[in-house]
From Swiss-Prot:
Family: Belongs to the somatotropin/prolactin family.
Protein name: Somatolactin
Biological process (GO), any one: animal organ development
Record's keyword terms, sorted: Disulfide bond, Glycoprotein, Hormone, Secreted, Signal
Highest taxon of source: Eukaryota
InterPro entries, sorted: 4_helix_cytokine-like_core, Somatotropin/Prolactin, Somatotropin_CS
Length: 230
């Protein structure tokens, strides 16, 4: 019994302390008599997750633009440096029609967000290591990539809590150690530079998916029949 109470207390502390996403202890609106349970509404959690996703997308766009200005030579034809064309992953397909959007479940949305977050943790860490080998890399670019990695980890924890609250389940396990890196194709010319550019471009694209899916989930909490991805 004592061990169970201790475990419950630690779980309550963890839920209240996920940095930057779940907010401060003052946001805990409901507690059990022991003071160990911290309850934040799904709506508040989604609002904070959306804020994180919006910032991640914005900073990813800034980092990509800065990298392009600094390291992509003007002599390379535009069609060779368009990073979006190098994103070959079909891990998460965005529904197109209104009927598809209406048919997808909250579970599908949360699982998709969880997958997108997980597959990008390793590539962003590798990108930081790669940038350390560049000459005259702007400190602002290093800061932005580190910031994205940190916020992505925060978003991962927030999504886990949302899955626990909304679906009563834990994390989604990736099959066969799925990695986004093997889905990114870099041209032979200046391969490492264009590969890093492709990583930034593809991450920006998937960061927008995360933001869009979270906003759809938030809209559904209001029972709005017109919720859409577009």
């Amino acid at each position: 019994m004592i061990k169970t109470k201790v475990l419950q207390a630690w779980m309550g502390i963890w839920l209240c302390a996920v940095n930057g996403l779940l907010g401060s202890d003052q946001d805990c609106s409901d507690r059990d008599p022991t003071g160990s349970r911290c309850s934040i509404s799904v709506e508040k959690l989604l609002d904070r997750a959306i804020q994180h996703a919006e910032l991640i997308y914005r900073i990813s766009d800034e980092a990509r633009t800065l990298f392009e200005e600094m390291f992509i030579p003007l002599l390379i034809p535009a069609h060779q440096v368009h990073g979006g064309n190098s994103c070959t992953s079909n891990l998460v397909r965005v529904p197109i029609s209104k009927l598809e959007i209406q048919q997808i479940s909250d579970k599908w949305l949360l699982h998709s967000i969880s997958i997108l977050v997980q597959v990008w943790i390793e590539p962003l860490a590798d990108l930081q290591d790669s940038l350390d080998m560049y000459d005259n890399v702007p400190s602002s670019l290093i800061s932005k990539t580190r910031w994205m990695s940190t916020k992505l980890m925060n978003l991962k924890q927030g999504v886990l809590v949302l899955m626990s609250k909304m679906l009563d389940e834990g994390s989604v396990e990736l099959e066969n150690n799925e990695s986004m890196l093997r889905h990114i194709v870099a041209p032979a010319m200046a391969e490492h530079v264009l590969r890093d550019y492709a990583v930034l471009s593809c991450f920006k694209k998937d960061a927008h998916k995360m933001e869009t899916f979270l906003k759809l989930l938030r809209c559904r909490q209001t029972d709005n029949p017109t919720c859409s991805l577009f």
